[in-house]
Amino acid sequence: MGLTISSLFSRLFGKKQMRILMVGLDAAGKTTILYKLKLGEIVTTIPTIGFNVETVEYKNICFTVWDVGGQDRIRPLWKHYFQNTQGLIFVVDSNDRERIQEVADELQKMLLVDELRDAVLLLFANKQDLPNAMAISEMTDKLGLQSLRNRTWYVQATCATQGTGLYEGLDWLSNELSKR
C-alpha cells in the first residue's frame, strides 16, 4: 500500500525521467546546445571525444541528455548509447551544405537500429543565424524526412549561441514523451 501511494505521489508531483541521446556531425553545436540548456549560457567548447552527460530539468521533466562526439571516427561508438533512449536529438549545422548528404546517411543508419525504434526524433536545425543557413523545408527535403513512416519527428530551427528555438524543441519533446 505504501509503495502504491508513494508511486502515485511521485507520478503526480515528481519529475518524469527521460533519457535523451544528442548526436550529429562534428561542429554541429551539440555541446553548445547542451550547456546552453543546462547553464543558460554559452561555454567555450572543444571537440567532444567521448561524451558529455547532463541533467536538464524542464517543465516537470528531468531530461538526462547524452551529448556524444560527432567526428567520423567516433560515430561507430554511438551505438553504445542507444539502449533505453526515449528521445533522439539530431543536431544539424544548417549552414554546412557540403555535408548534408553525410548527415542524411548517418541519420538513416540510426533510424534503422532496432534499439531506437520507439525513440521520438527531434532535429535541431542549428546555426539559423548564419546568412546561408538552409531553411527547414530544404533541410527536411534533403534529409528525406517526409518518407519516414512509423516515426514521430519534428524539425526545430535553432541558434545555440543565442538560445533561440532550444526551448521550443524541448516543448515538443516533452509533449511527445509525456504521451507515452
Swiss-Prot record:
Coiled coil: none annotated. This is ADP-ribosylation factor 4. GTP binds at residues 24-31, 67-71, 126-129. It is found in: Golgi apparatus; Membrane. GO terms for molecular function: epidermal growth factor receptor binding; GTP binding; GTPase activity; guanyl-nucleotide exchange factor activity; NAD+-protein-arginine ADP-ribosyltransferase activity; phospholipase D activator activity. It is a lipid-anchor. GTP-binding protein that functions as an allosteric activator of the cholera toxin catalytic subunit, an ADP-ribosyltransferase. Involved in protein trafficking; may modulate vesicle budding and uncoating within the Golgi apparatus. Part of the ciliary targeting complex containing Rab11, ASAP1, Rabin8/RAB3IP, RAB11FIP3 and ARF4, which direct preciliary vesicle trafficking to mother centriole and ciliogenesis initiation. It comes from Homo sapiens. A lipid is attached at residue 2 (N-myristoyl glycine). Forms a complex containing RAB11A, ASAP1, RAB3IP, RAP11FIP3 and ARF4; the complex promotes preciliary trafficking; the complex binds to RHO in photoreceptor cells and promotes RHO ciliary transport. GO terms for cellular component: cytoplasm; cytosol; dendritic spine; extracellular exosome; glutamatergic synapse; Golgi membrane; membrane; plasma membrane. GO terms for biological process: apical protein localization; cell migration; cilium assembly; dendritic spine development; endoplasmic reticulum to Golgi vesicle-mediated transport; epidermal growth factor receptor signaling pathway; establishment or maintenance of epithelial cell apical/basal polarity; intracellular protein transport.
